[in-house]
């Protein structure tokens, strides 16, 4: 069976069925949407309206984006589902837990990292995870007290709980994803 676009040769002249234009989000819009999604995947109307003002998107599009993002998260967590974020080049591996030296003057930047596993040049830099490793049953609420960046306001964010949901991170993709969010918030 042909798709509606293929089945309607009159589509180019405006006679065929109308197809809704796909929304393209800018990098800034996506970063803001992902940041809020990490804190609250089910935002209330006031949060969505605030996002609409910040991103210059209609509230309805923001609501649909959150619905789609929740569906994607559920799909990614199904057993046996391939997760594109975890696909690494064959000659690349995640490093062991790095030992970091922190400069108290600049709490968000490590001075250096020593790890027993060195990355190869083909490894993308985002594969090294500098977030604390949490065991089963641990949550970010317990880890935030030991976080080197503290729990005071960072770039308008009031606490780590607003960046990262308080759930157990037994899934490696969640850990990598959360680390990227914390890193992005830290550098913004």
Curated annotation (Swiss-Prot):
Residues 111-125 have a biased composition (Polar residues). Residues 18-77 bind DNA. Gene3D superfamilies: Homeodomain-like. GO terms for biological process: embryo development ending in birth or egg hatching; oogenesis. The keyword DNA-binding applies. The keyword Nucleus applies. Residues 80-125 are annotated as: Disordered. GO terms for molecular function: DNA binding. Probable transcription factor involved in the control of specification of mesoderm and endoderm. This is Homeobox protein SEBOX. The gene is Sebox.
């Amino acid at each position: 069976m042909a798709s509606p676009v293929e089945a309607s040769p009159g589509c180019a002249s405006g006679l065929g069925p109308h197809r809704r234009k796909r929304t393209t989000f800018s990098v800034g819009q996506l970063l803001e949407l992902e940041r809020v999604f990490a804190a609250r995947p089910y935002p209330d109307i006031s949060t969505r309206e605030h996002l609409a003002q910040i991103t210059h998107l209609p509230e309805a599009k923001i609501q649909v984006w959150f619905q789609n993002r929740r569906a994607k998260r559920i799909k990614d967590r199904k057993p046996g589902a391939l997760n594109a974020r975890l696909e690494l080049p064959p000659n690349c591996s995640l490093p062991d837990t790095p030992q970091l030296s922190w400069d108290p003057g600049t709490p968000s930047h490590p001075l250096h990292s020593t790890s027993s596993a060195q990355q190869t040049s083909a490894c993308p830099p985002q594969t090294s995870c500098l977030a604390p490793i949490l065991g089963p049953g641990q949550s970010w609420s317990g880890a935030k007290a030991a976080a080197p960046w503290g729990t005071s306001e960072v770039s308008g964010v009031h606490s780590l709980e607003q960046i990262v949901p308080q759930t157990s991170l037994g899934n490696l993709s969640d850990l990598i994803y959360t680390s990227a969010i914390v890193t992005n918030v830290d550098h913004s």
